[in-house]
Curated annotation (Swiss-Prot):
Cytoplasmic side: 33-48, 98-101, 159-164, 218-224, 284-285, 363-395, 452-470
InterPro entries referenced in this protein's UniProt entry, alphabetically: MFS, MFS_dom, MFS_trans_sf, Multi-R_MdtD
Family classification: Belongs to the major facilitator superfamily. TCR/Tet family.
A Pfam cross-reference name: MFS_1
Organism per entry: Salmonella typhi
Statement: the UniProt record of this protein carries the keyword Flavoprotein: no
Superkingdom classification of source: Bacteria
Membrane-topology annotation of the record: Multi-pass membrane protein
Gene (UniProt): mdtD
PROSITE patterns cross-referenced by the UniProt entry: MFS
Periplasmic side: 1-11, 70-76, 125-137, 186-196, 246-262, 307-341, 417-430
NCBIfam families, per database record: PRK10504.1
Identification of the protein by name: Putative multidrug resistance protein MdtD
Amino acid sequence: MTEFPDNTRWQLWIVAFGFFMQSLDTTIVNTALPSMAKSLGESPLHMHMVVVSYVLTVAVMLPASGWLADKIGVRNIFFAAIVLFTLGSLFCALSGTLNQLVLARVLQGVGGAMMVPVGRLTVMKIVPRAQYMAAMTFVALPGQIGPLLGPALGGVLVEYASWHWIFLINIPVGIVGAMATFMLMPNYTIETRRFDLPGFLLLAIGMAVLTLALDGSKSMGISPWTLAGLAAGGAAAILLYLFHAKKNSGALFSLRLFRTPTFSLGLLGSFAGRIGSGMLPFMTPVFLQIGLGFSPFHAGLMMIPMVLGSMGMKRIVVQIVNRFGYRRVLVATTLGLALVSLLFMSVALLGWYYLLPLVLLLQGMVNSARFSSMNTLTLKDLPDTLASSGNSLLSMIMQLSMSIGVTIAGMLLGMFGQQHIGIDSSATHHVFMYTWLCMAVIIALPAIIFARVPNDTQQNMVISRRKRSL
């Protein structure tokens, strides 16, 4: 057992607390969406922007978080992240309209974007390199508990209090965390290169405008010509960034990353793959409540097997990849996830509710194997000089693709659910059935990309749990 000095242990607890807050918030909201819709006078089929606004903001802000921490100091930025996250939570709870809630989620997302990467950077600075793995294991555990606790806790709060409490519980916790950060966390700074502000703005504008163009006609009533202009503007911003990065050695993300074939394939596959899988955590609790009439608490409990399956698969995924190779694992898990998603809908509509936890457990296992394989494939062949930049770009793409996935899911629900639908009605079942069929196709398509992954040339190392010190 690795022993840390008392002051270091307290600092690690602060980082772990930030990981927990951020991971809890990513899952606790989904269960509450139907109740939020009823309270705000909105259709539950149009509540996806509550999720998209948060995840997209995280994607936009991630590239700036590490630079800000180096320039201004890890304590100052981590403190600011907790304060912004807590203020965003307060404004979410006070929101009286969907637009107010979306804006509050943007503020919350700014704080959430800085918590995890700055937390990792803090750990690197406060512990010796030899203890880094043990320290990261220590701080990451609460982050794994958050997704497990979030759906059930969200269901309890919604059912026995109100949806406002899923945000209000962050306030006292955030105040304590901010005070502890300010008093106990050292403020490490280092000399940094100039921040690529033009590149950051081009990427931010491109991501935000393209996501808005996907859903603007349904949620905001934007005309088709305006949407076409937005899509063209977003694409132009991304193309301008590529031109900027080609001419600028200090660009936010170097184009030299794409000289590594597995990085290019892995990044493209991760983007396409997470669009499909990003729909599932949003759609599943909404379907359980609106489509099947489950209570918020019951729907939250049903999400736990999916998280347990995901956590359990992480223990054996390296051995599976070593045995079968990246290409076979990624193609099989991609097609398997599409089939399992269809199995979930079939079992639900047949009324075999007792099988749903087993199907969701299987879904979590398959999804986790695919996620872990995509991540390691993308980064494993990068040279050390580009590893940090590649990891940051992958993190941004992961968040962006999930926001696009939720946006597309909301767009599909709006397209198939034009008429008023009731809870657990035949019309509602048809809306979700057609949506799930489209989702299964979207989930399966990245198999075409993963089929191009080259044969593996080296084995992945398996860490022995008997020899690892914590």
